[in-house]
Amino acid sequence: MKNRFYYNLIIKRLYTRSGGLRKPQKVTNDPESINRKVYWCFEHKPVKRTIINLIYSHNELKIFSNLLNHPTVGSSLIHELSLDGPYTAFFPSNEAMQLINIESFNKLYNDENKLSEFVLNHVTKEYWLYRDLYGSSYQPWLMYNEKREAPEKLRNLLNNDLIVKIEGEFKHCNHSIYLNGSKIIRPNMKCHNGVVHIVDKPIIF
């Protein structure tokens, strides 16, 4: 009887120290409830890095990051992409940058105006997560209070249009999103001043 008393006391303390709950709460399998909890857990998590921090730290953006080291326009590009935004960027991976032949790349790097245009053509205003490009079906989000329709095009920082094309079905997980023919291969890298998606080809006008 005495052992039973101590057993109950220990169990009681365990429940008390586990979040202060003496009565364990029932677990739900309701998808909507789970989605809300996951949303609040991750959507509102603060992010300290900026887009510039991400460019210099991500292994898939090493070649692209070299463009920001340009002696003439590099500092102005860094300044612009460090502002509050929010921005949505579609930066080409190392493999994508290698699609540009050496001669063309050297011409691009040696022409400061073309270099600046090349970088800014990959950046748009506003905050577009991958799901928003497909059309958000859940609400409310952190920055928007209503459902967002999938855009037909986005306007970049140079006022050029990025045509959004969707292939496949989101619910079947066989979908792809293209911007001017460049496919998003790594989405939703959130930053303090926006979000970055990596694409498989440079966006060239």
Swiss-Prot record:
Documented effect of changing H175A: 50% reduction in catalytic activity. 50% reduction in catalytic activity
Listed under catalytic activity are:
2 Fe(III)-heme b = beta-hematin
Q: Which PROSITE patterns match?
A: FAS1
Provide the pH dependence. Optimum pH is 4.5-5.2.
According to the entry, every stretch annotated as the FAS1 domain falls at 48-203
Reported effect, H79A: No effect on catalytic activity. 50% reduction in catalytic activity
The compartments listed are: Vacuole; Host cytoplasm, Host cytosol
Q: Provide the Gene Ontology terms for cellular component.
A: food vacuole; host cell cytoplasm; host cell cytosol
Molecular function GO terms recorded? heme binding; heme oxygenase (decyclizing) activity; lyase activity
Q: Where is this site: Heme binding?
A: H122, H175
Q: Where is this region: Required for binding to host hemoglobin?
A: 154-172
Q: Which domain of life is it from?
A: Eukaryota
Alphabetically list the UniProt keywords. Host cytoplasm, Lyase, Vacuole
Q: Where is this region: Heme binding domain?
A: 171-181, 191-200
Q: Please give the Gene3D superfamilies that the UniProt record associates with this protein.
A: FAS1 domain (2.30.180.10)
Note the subunit structure. Component of the hemozoin formation complex (HFC) composed of falcipains FP2A and/or FP2B, plasmepsins PMII, PMIII/HAP and PMIV, heme detoxifying protein HDP and falcilysin FLN. The HFC complex is involved in hemoglobin degradation and detoxification of heme in the food vacuole during the asexual blood stage. Interacts with falcipain 2; the interaction is direct and enhances HDP catalytic activity. Interacts with host hemoglobin.
- Role noted for this protein: Heme detoxifying enzyme that converts heme to crystalline hemozoin (beta-hematin) to protect the organism from the toxic effects of heme. During its development, P.falciparum proteolyzes vast amounts of host hemoglobin, leading to heme release.
The name this protein carries in UniProt is Heme ligase
Source organism of the structure = Plasmodium falciparum (isolate 3D7)
Organism lineage reads as: Eukaryota, Sar, Alveolata, Apicomplexa, Aconoidasida
